[in-house]
Design a protein with these regions (language model features):
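Non-catalytic, conformational "gating/processing" segments within enzyme and secreted inhibitor domains
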Residues: 1-96
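Short loop/turn and capping residues at structural boundaries
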Residues: 15, 120-121
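Flexible, low-complexity segments enriched for small/polar residues
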Residues: 74-113, 122-344
Length: 344
């Protein structure tokens, strides 16, 4: 029956029809192609019937509005929206408890506010549940419950590590290399998120495909693009695949970043440096054994902490980053390879 409501609507030239509420171009109704009969819906829609008040384009639009109102009057519509929001921002799994204690109140807020999204966002993002403070059950973690999309993985790295972006006016060629070849061509294209070109009209599988959802972004075909990102940043090249030595138009100077970013309170102290980096990079701080893996095995490479302190002081005095670049590079690779870093 709903399909009958849509009969007679078609494309129109962009400038001919402007929607009065949104001020954006809209399609056009052609009454000669519309089914003006009464549309009788099932018990799931309370046996509602939709009939046109007039047999012209205004009547067609009235039917369309009636169909929209009928759909939004259903409690399940609001719940569906809120489930989609929950899976986008919190976690892919919705248990019966979450459905009753989180989704249902959000849906009620959605309906009570005439389907305005902001009150729902405020309620969700301000809840104890969102910050994983509503219980002590370690088996239902909210923080770190979502796998980053390739876009999130790349842009968060660019922002956090303060990667210098080439100026599009004075460094036009490098700007194109950075975005077209580096970000779009290598990280996103091979990472399973060819930007603006989803595989079908439903969008990217990571946002809707059950039961995996965001796990769709992390598989045997896309993992290389994710794990080669630190090498791309440190070498300033595509790092892998065709033309692996080609420049991406910029390069990450990690020693200068550690020195100048203001993130690290005492870079000379290896323990403090690793601790503060992990606090920023991971959803939650790792436990003792995991932390020691990054500090002792990766960063210090089994050497005494004093070795790093000496190398850092020497770097500050001479500007030569040869010795500090090696342990910092090991640490960056290990952190960005870590499962924890792939989570948000």
């Amino acid at each position: 029956e709903a399909a009958r409501v849509f009969t007679g609507f078609n494309l129109a030239f962009r400038h001919l029809n402007i929607d009065p509420e949104t001020a954006i171009p809209s399609g056009k109704g052609y009454p000669q192609s519309h089914d003006f009969g009464t549309k009788q819906f099932s018990v799931r829609f309370n046996n509602a019937a939709i009939s046109p008040p007039s047999q012209d384009e205004a009547g067609m639009l009235a039917e369309l509005n009636a169909l929209t109102d009928m759909i939004f009057a259903q409690e399940e519509t609001a719940r569906h929206f809120c489930r989609r929001l929950y899976r986008m921002f919190v976690h892919r799994n919705i248990t019966d408890e979450i459905e009753n204690e989180v989704i249902a109140p959000l849906a009620q807020t959605f309906r009570d506010n005439d389907f305005e999204m902001m009150p729902v966002f405020r309620q969700l993002f301000g809840s104890q549940h969102f910050f994983d403070e509503d219980d002590s059950d370690n088996a239902d973690e909210i923080v770190g419950g979502i796998i980053k999309s390739p876009l999130e993985l790349a842009l968060q790295a660019y922002a956090f590590f303060q990667i210098p972006i080439p100026d599009p006016l004075t460094q036009h060629a490098d700007y194109l290399r950075f975005y077209q070849h580096g970000l779009f061509g290598r990280v996103l294209g091979f990472g399973g998120m060819d930007l603006f070109y989803p595989p079908d009209v439903a969008g990217y599988p990571g946002y809707f495909q059950q039961p995996g959802f965001q796990r769709q972004f992390f598989n045997s075909a896309t993992i290389v693009a994710r794990y080669k990102l630190p090498q791309m940043l440190l070498t300033g090249t595509l790092a892998w695949g065709p033309n692996s030595d080609a420049s991406i138009g910029t390069k990450f100077d990690m020693a200068a970043w550690v020195r100048d970013s203001g993130i690290f309170s005492d870079p000379e102290d290896g323990y403090v440096l690793v601790q503060e980096l992990l606090d920023y990079a991971f959803p939650e701080h790792p436990d003792g054994d995991r932390f020691n893996y990054f500090l002792v095995q990766i960063f210090l490479d089994g050497l005494p902490p004093a070795d790093w302190s000496y190398e850092w002081v020497n770097y500050l005095a001479t500007g030569d980053d040869t010795e500090v670049r090696i342990p910092l590079g090991r640490l960056l690779n290990a952190v960005m390879y870590a499962p924890e870093y792939q989570l948000a």
